[in-house]
Structures are given as structure tokens and as C-alpha cells.
Amino acid sequence: MSNIAILAGDGIGPEVMVEAKKVLNTVASKFDFEITTQDYDIGGAAIDNHGNALPDSTMAGCIESDAILFGSVGGPKWANLPPTEQPERCALLGLRSHFDLFCNMRPATLQPALSSLSTLRSDISEQGFDVLVIRELTGDIYFGEPKGRRGEGEEETGFDSMFYSRREVKRISHLAFQAAQKRNNKVTSVDKANVLATSQLWRQVVEEVAVEYPDVELEHLYVDNAAMQLVRDPNQFDVMLCPNLFGDILSDICAMITGSMGLLPSASLNSDGFGMYEPAGGSAPDIAGLGVANPIAQILSAALMLRYSLNQGAAAKAIEDAVSNALDNGVLTADLLPANERKNAKSTSEVGDYICKQIESA
């Protein structure tokens, strides 16, 4: 039996999580495995109830779990708190740090049926694409020390430090090559090795790791060229392996060219296969409680959890196929429809119900 910590959070988090749990129960029944779920407060809801965005009780529940299914956190109510107390920073960074979740996987898929949503030219978007961005999460300029500000007046200076160790690059590289072996056997490593010492080390270590995966093609791109190529022809990519800063930027480009953040799941993993799974989008407080939120990113996050942490690949594939059927058959929330067709939009629960029925009938 697998134990899942459910951290629905704020905004639309609770309502899309209902649909993800519904789908999980459906595939568990279909594929004859057992899961248990336990709900815990996180983010703004936890601040209101416990005075802390990441309470001890929530952390204890996560420690006892086999995986974390995370919703979304934050909203205007908590926006004026000190930065270290804000839901997004306290909750997410606290969990990433405690569990050493160094690998972020964000699939970005555009199905031809939804090509009109993409910001790309129609001749590009109509081909569809399927890119997996693997981003190192715990190193790079975000966490390097020293950092800060010093001096006064016109001479005041802000500074940051960019660091990567051989160990950090090696472990994320192995995961990228292993992911490529399960896809289309190509890794594009992104760096700025013509300028940065960290990128020179990054490229060297990636090439050393690549020797262990002779069936996987490796190419290197400078980050500026990678950004340009993503919007020129995303179909050329399979797995993109990125340092923290570059991956942060490129994964958001991938999100934009799919046309909706409501479709994009993500996984954050450690070396033991423990992971936290969450939608790529935010808490969308402006539509919370209206029953119009798109639950697909949350549902696909549950599919990633089944694949990478719970060893239920067939169940994950069943969810993904059911989602594809929903999209192909026009079972869409309002964010996926042009303004003149939104009268035909399905509610959050209707989309979840349809996906469950597709799984049951497959």
C-alpha cells in the first residue's frame, strides 16, 4: 500500500485536488493496487490555522508518506508578509530542502487538437511537441553564497554567487539520460560554457556521464540559442537538461508555447525516488471556488507520481491517455476555449468525471 500526503493548499488547489484524488481512486481500482491519502495544511491555509506555512504536523505527515501531491499556495491575503514567511517561499523551499528534491521534471506537451492555443505559428504548432525539461533545483546562483548588497549611494552593489559541484551535475545528468532512454533517446544540455566557469564544469561532467549511455544522443546548446530554438521549432527537442537558473526560464517558455499553464504538471525528485508533484501554474485566487478551474495539470501531476515514485507506470499511462481523449474530444474548461465558445466549457468536476469514465472504459 502507498501512502500519499495531500497538500491541497490555497486558491484553486483544493478543488482541483478533489479531481486528482477521484482519478487516483479510479486507477487504483482499475489496476488493483491500494493507496491511502491524508490531507495536511500548507501555505496560506496553514498560516491561518497554524501560524506557519509549513507546520510541523504537515512535515511529519510528509516524512511518513511515499510521495507528496501538492496543489498550489499563496494569494493576495498573504502577499504582504515578510519574504521568508510568504507561503510560496516557506512551503515550497522548506519541502525541497528537507527532502533534497534536486531534480525538477516538467513535461510540456502540445497536442495537435489544441494547436490553436499555442503562441507559435500555426505551421509549427500543428505538428505538436513533447519536451521534458529536467532542471537542477538545489544549486546555481539561487543558493550560492556569498550574496547580498554592500556600499552606499551610486557605489552600492548587489552580488550573487553561482556554484555547481561535480556531484550535483553528475546526479542530475544521470536522471536526464535515464529519462531520455524511456522517451526518444536524446538529451540537449543547456549551458553558457563560452562565458561561465560553472557552465564549463557542467558541460565537462555531462559529457563524462554521457559515455555511460551510448544509446542516447547528446547535444549542447548555449542558453540563448536554446531559448531561440524552443520558439522556432520545439519538436526538435526530447529531454532538455538545465542548470537551475536556465531551467527556470526555459521551462516557463515551454509552458507559454503550450498555450495554457492549466495543462502542465511537474515533479521534484530526490535520489531515492521520493517526490513532490504539483501543477506548474499558481493558485489563481480570482477563480477559486467558481468550479471553472482546469484540473488537468493536477491530474497529470498525479500520473507523474504514479510513474516516478509509486512504480505504477501502467496506471500513469492510463491517466495520460484519458486526458488526451478528453482534450481531443473537446471536454475543456474555459481557459482552453476561445471567448466565443466558452458557453460550451465544462466545469472542473465534469472534466474529472469524464477522465475517470475514460479510464474505466479503456
From Swiss-Prot:
What quaternary structure, including any partners, is listed in this protein's UniProt entry? Homodimer.
Instruction: Provide a Gene Ontology MF annotation, just one.
Output: 3-isopropylmalate dehydrogenase activity
Protein residues bound to NAD(+): 75-88, 282-294
Catalytic activities: (2R,3S)-3-isopropylmalate + NAD(+) = 4-methyl-2-oxopentanoate + CO2 + NADH
Q: What pathway does the UniProt record associate with this protein?
A: Amino-acid biosynthesis; L-leucine biosynthesis; L-leucine from 3-methyl-2-oxobutanoate: step 3/4
Cofactor(s) recorded for this entry are:
Mg(2+); Mn(2+)
PROSITE patterns xref list: IDH_IMDH
The record's Gene Ontology cellular component field reads:
cytosol
What does the sequence similarity comment in the record state about its family? Belongs to the isocitrate and isopropylmalate dehydrogenases family. LeuB type 1 subfamily.
EC main group: oxidoreductase
Q: Which residues bind substrate?
A: R96, R106, R135, D224
**Residue sites binding Mg(2+) per the record:** D224, D248, D252
Some GO term, biological process aspect, for this entry: which one?
A: L-leucine biosynthetic process
Gene, per the UniProt record: leuB
Annotated protein name in UniProt: 3-isopropylmalate dehydrogenase
